[in-house]
Amino acid sequence: MRRLIEAYRPERIYLFGSKARGDEGPDSDYDLMVVVPDEAPPERRRSRLAYEVLRGTRTATDVVVCTRSWFDARLHLRASFPSTIVREGKLLHAA
C-alpha cells in the first residue's frame, strides 16, 4: 500500500471484491481502486504504474485507477462500479 501511495499520491484507495466482502478463496487476489486527483499527470492515471511499483511483492493484486471526477460522477448510480465499491468495499486510504 505504501508503494501505491508514494507512486500515485491518491485521494482514496478502496479494497473491493471478494477480499473486501470476506468471501475470498485460496486463489483470490486483492482488487484495489485508486482514485487520483483530476490534475494527476497522465502516467498517474494508468494502472501500469501500479504493476511496476508492486512488482516483486509476491501479492496478487489487480489495480483500477480513475480520476476523482469520474468516480464521484457515478456514485449516485446504484449499479455503477464506484457505487458498488463504496457500498461493498473498504476504504483503505484517504488523503
Question: Can you describe what each PLM-predicted range is?
Answer:
Residues 1-12, 20-26, 36-95:
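Catalytic core of pol beta-like nucleotidyltransferases
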Residues 31-35:
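Short beta-strand->loop micro-motif that forms the acidic, two-metal-ion catalytic signature
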